[in-house]
UniProtKB/Swiss-Prot annotation:
Record keywords: Chloroplast, Plastid, Ribonucleoprotein, Ribosomal protein
InterPro entries membership: Ribosomal_uL16, Ribosomal_uL16_bact-type, Ribosomal_uL16_CS, Ribosomal_uL16_dom, Ribosomal_uL16_sf
Family matches, as CDD domains: Ribosomal_L16_L10e
Naturally occurring in which organism (per UniProt): Solanum tuberosum
Alphabetical GO biological process terms: mitochondrial translation
Protein name (database record): Large ribosomal subunit protein uL16c
Length: 134
């Protein structure tokens, strides 16, 4: 699973996802891509599940690029803990994705193989996405 090697701070505020993605919203490596249509936090597990689904479906053919990286720590408090006594400890990592962001790219395969592989990855994502061609 993806996570940063080291970070400047252990914990982060949740923040909010306003507007559309201004970066990473064009295909730059492959020919086909999966684009987010709604704002979401995508966990490192979901990113990995999507990547695995695509690689298994493509079967050695083509190349896959993962265009997002989980760099935001999400903290959780233990179950049945009273309020107070500080913020919880970091449990997992998420990538903050705004509408328009490219999640995965694929190249070196035919369109129908890419469509099938990318639709499998899309089913692993928590929000609506679309298939695009450069």
């Amino acid at each position: 699973m993806l996570s940063p090697k080291r970070t400047r701070f252990r914990k982060q505020h949740r923040g909010r996802m306003k507007g559309i993605s201004s970066r990473g919203n064009h295909i730059s490596f492959g020919k086909y891509a999966l684009q987010a249509l709604e704002p979401a936090w995508i966990t490192s597990r979901q990113i990995e599940a999507g990547r695995r689904a695509m690689t298994r479906n493509a079967r050695r053919g083509g190349k896959i690029w993962v265009r997002i990286f989980p760099d935001k720590p999400v903290t959780l408090r233990p179950a049945e803990t009273r309020m107070g006594s500080g913020k919880g400890s970091p449990e997992y990592w998420v990538a903050v994705v705004k509408p328009g962001r490219i999640l995965y790219e694929m190249g070196g395969v035919t369109e129908n193989i890419a469509r099938r592989a990318i639709s499998l990855a899309a089913s692993k994502m928590p929000k609506r996405t679309q298939f695009i061609i450069s």
